[in-house]
Amino acid sequence: MAKDLDELLDEVETKFCRLDPLRLDLGERPKGGSGGGGTHSGDRNGAQEKDTLRSTETFKKEDDLDSLINEIFEEPNFDKKSFQKFKSKSSSNTSVRAPIQGLSKSCSPVYLSGSAIPCGIGTNTSQRACDRLRCVACDFQIVSYNDYMWDKSCDYLFFRNNMPEFHKLKTKLIEKKGARAYACQCSWRTVEELTDLQADHELRWVCGKH
């Protein structure tokens, strides 16, 4: 699109901004013969011819300019909305930043819980289980399964080899109403009650922001 606009500007400059040799030739043409009466008549005729030529050229150039603009707009890959994007660049950047900032809320404190507690942004007044947990040790997003608990035979290699595929992990999941099974690639927990994450010093889980 930018290339098309540059070509359009170059063509407009070439056709409409440079002096016309024909017009210069008319301006430099002698204004009449040696006789006094022929001079005034020649001047009037020459002026009328130049005015007519200018009017004709003006309409022709306007039509050519409209045609060039229409050709650009009719290109298959031309995005007509791009001009609006350029005009409202600053306002659009502001509108983009606003929702991003709105999605940058973190739980404080961070809670784990059983399936009876809803998930969401945890605060001191709104005790919800964080569902945007991430492990800073293995850099994995924490998965959780409602109404399940981990089998006691689970070990590090099991999660290392099977995360985050549920069809593989479910071989070590046991149904338990009210429980919630959490796991990353290096740690796992079964939780039934609302628990402050800071109380478990072995876990290196943090809220990944909502």
Curated annotation (Swiss-Prot):
The keyword ATP-binding does not apply. Residues 1-77 are annotated as: Required for interaction with FAM161A. One of its GO terms (biological process) is photoreceptor cell morphogenesis. Keywords: Cytoplasm. It comes from the Eukaryota. InterPro entries: CFAP418. Residues 41-59 have a biased composition (Basic and acidic residues). It is found in: Cytoplasm; Photoreceptor inner segment. Its main location: cytoplasm. GO terms for cellular component: ciliary base; cytoplasm; cytosol; photoreceptor inner segment. Pfam families: RMP. Residues 24-59 are annotated as: Disordered. May be involved in photoreceptor outer segment disk morphogenesis. PANTHER family: CILIA- AND FLAGELLA-ASSOCIATED PROTEIN 418, PROTEIN C8ORF37. Interacts (via N-terminus) with FAM161A (via central region); the interaction is direct. This is Cilia- and flagella-associated protein 418. The lineage of its organism: Eukaryota, Metazoa, Chordata, Craniata, Vertebrata. The gene is Cfap418.
